[in-house]
Amino acid sequence: MKANFGKKEGEYSRLVSKSSNKLLNSLWEKKQIPEEGWSEHTLDLFLSWLSSHDTNNRVDMIPVGAGEREGRVLTPLVQRLHSNLTHGIGRSGNLLEIQPKALGSSMLACLSNEFAKHALHLLGLHAVKSCIVVPLCTGMSLSLCMTSWRRRRPKAKYVVWLRIDQKSSLKSIYHAGFEPIIVEPIRDRDSLITDVETVNRIIEQRGEEILCVMTTTSCFAPRSPDNVEAISAICAAHDVPHLVNNAYGLQSEETIRKIAAAHECGRVDAVVQSLDKNFQVPVGGAVIAAFKQNHIQSIAQSYPGRASSVPSRDLVLTLLYQGQSAFLEPFGKQKQMFLKMRRKLISFAENIGECVYEVPENEISSAMTLSTIPPAKQTLFGSILFAKGITGARVVTSSQSKTTIEGCEFINFGSHTTEQHGGYLNIACSVGMTDHELEELFTRLTSSYAKFVRELAKEDERINSSGRRIPINESFDMEND
């Protein structure tokens, strides 16, 4: 039966097509996160629109690929997973360059960079001039920045690295072909803070041998975020690049304020942040931000080859889905959740005879002492928490043993300092944590701790009565309290 479509229906069809095109074209013209989030249907439409710009997906001609890379994908499932965007981003030797036969993929890369900059502006880094989304982890992104500065400082051999007991930032220095000069933090009550005087002295002594200073603004308590304002002033005075490892620091208003202030009072050449930790997307990407346009240009030109567009795609889709208001909401929620977590941790600590470190500048991580658990049993307690489904929490013990990473020896690795301590528990509140998760965390933590200390007491009784030590993990039921 022939469908009876008249003039009215035809006009409606043209209106729908016109509205869709207007929405997509408006996005491309503005290159900003929309006020309101988009539906999944609209996101599918957006991806189809982008992929239709790549030559291998054109409908107005049959492409004939005569090169070594023509967007060919054998498996239909893989092609669908990538939404027919198979060319990647950039051209050989420049991540920002447009690929003529992959216009849609290049548009996606452009949108991701502009969205990242807009997101940082919304969070408070208003002076950021340029961003680039790279398909690299935070450590590799740090390495890319350092590699790009090699020509600017041909005599450089070293990177001044403020100790943070996290392997990837240290490895990034060696991967870029440099060696670290390690600066230990200093104690300020409970906090481990930046040794500014030592950094200044090293730069004065080494001068052109220093490639850059790498500071860290997101870390586990009791380490405090580095004093980026003071370091930026030193770097400006001595004309030394300043690289900020801001892995998950976008979640902290105080960290955002400190980075903005560092730019105002001194020198900040690049700020690196993780996509998955800040934007709730899968692991695999980072945002490199700069306060000068040419700083990003040089970093983009140091990337060898083309790059995967997957992290760019995931970021763009996530920000389109959220819109501006929904994007900011989890960051405001994180601050409330952190304060709530800290109150509950202090209450729990007081009930069991422990205390919580006072690290006022760290708005993401907290640390509680474990003096009521023997040092030899603290690691086991951490394992039990993991077995109970508490992921991300860490038990940090203290010892004189040495850990070697890339030839560097560290005493007490994991503690950010050589100082001895009684052991502590780290927990963090990151973007996306819910009230239910927080309540369940303390329910499991409370019950696990109570049973653990009961088993410790029973073990002591067995030792006293029989002289035979029965390991606590033999008697601790991992499944049932």
From Swiss-Prot:
Location in or out of the cell: Cytoplasm
Positions carrying N6-(pyridoxal phosphate)lysine: K277
Keyword list, A-Z: Cytoplasm, Protein biosynthesis, Pyridoxal phosphate, RNA-binding, Selenium, Transferase, tRNA-binding
One GO molecular-function entry: tRNA binding
Pathway assigned to this chain's UniProt record: Aminoacyl-tRNA biosynthesis; selenocysteinyl-tRNA(Sec) biosynthesis; selenocysteinyl-tRNA(Sec) from L-seryl-tRNA(Sec) (archaeal/eukaryal route): step 2/2
Cofactor: pyridoxal 5'-phosphate
Annotated positions binding substrate: R91, S92, Q99, R306
Phosphate loop (P-loop) as annotated region, ranges: 90-100
Annotated binding of pyridoxal 5'-phosphate, by residue: R69
EC number, UniProt record: 2.9.1.2
Main subcellular location of this protein, as a coarse class: cytoplasm
Entry superkingdom: Eukaryota
Pfam families for this protein: SepSecS
Ranges for region Tetramerization: 1-36
Top enzyme category: transferase
Transmembrane feature ranges: none
Similarity comment: family membership: Belongs to the SepSecS family.
Subunit structure comment from the entry: Homotetramer formed by a catalytic dimer and a non-catalytic dimer serving as a binding platform that orients tRNASec for catalysis. Each tetramer binds the CCA ends of two tRNAs which point to the active sites of the catalytic dimer.
Function: Converts O-phosphoseryl-tRNA(Sec) to selenocysteinyl-tRNA(Sec) required for selenoprotein biosynthesis.
NCBIfam families per record: selenium_SpcS
Name listed for the protein in its UniProt record: O-phosphoseryl-tRNA(Sec) selenium transferase
Name of the gene this protein is made from: secs-1
